């Protein structure tokens, strides 16, 4: 399945592919 977004991204970068730091500071599906 697809990777799950949801990590915190206080630095503005998400480590999970296909995820965006929006709304900050939580990664959500880009």
Curated annotation (Swiss-Prot):
Cross-link (Cyclopeptide (Gly-Asp)): 1-30
Keyword Disulfide bond: yes
GO biological process assignments: defense response
Matches recorded under Pfam families: Cyclotide (PF03784)
Alphabetical list of InterPro entries matching this protein: Cyclotide, Cyclotide_moebius_CS, Cyclotide_sf
Keywords recorded for this protein, A-Z: Disulfide bond, Knottin, Plant defense
Family designation: Belongs to the cyclotide family. Moebius subfamily.
Protein name per its UniProtKB record: Kalata-B13
Organism: Oldenlandia affinis
């Amino acid at each position: 399945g697809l990777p799950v977004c949801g990590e915190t991204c206080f630095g503005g970068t998400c480590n999970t592919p296909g995820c965006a730091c929006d709304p900050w500071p939580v990664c959500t599906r880009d």
